[in-house]
């Protein structure tokens, strides 16, 4: 996923294996459970710890710059953040910002699926830009940086696939629906 950095130590071109998200969207209809049974699925740990571990070790083995974990604040696109929003996100300690990690991660959890996100830092968000140290975000820069990292992403995924465990491994993701339905 293409993301913007909210922290100066997370640089353009770095990778982040995301482990949390903040939903700042106004999207509706982001559940598979619209009744008649009420279902509350926990997203306390929304990304798969097994896949995240495989992604992290693979990226490190390839010698690529990676950050272990990070919180992505998902905003309503298509506009980028204002400086005020970006400064707030940064002060909250969140790491990255994008427009697409939600609802995919929540929907995967509702299906008891393992889900991993490898984020590519394509730009610095408006708050860091306001500090004067970096250039403002542009669509051209985002596309250029993501395209430059596409080969690395393909290499990472190809290296991860044979490491993904079979159904005999008891991953916590498989139990996401245990006790979630209220009948």
Protein language model regions, located:
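Glycine-rich phosphate- or other oxyanion-binding loops that anchor nucleotides, phosphorylated ligands
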Residues: 2-132, 140, 144-147, 156-162, ...
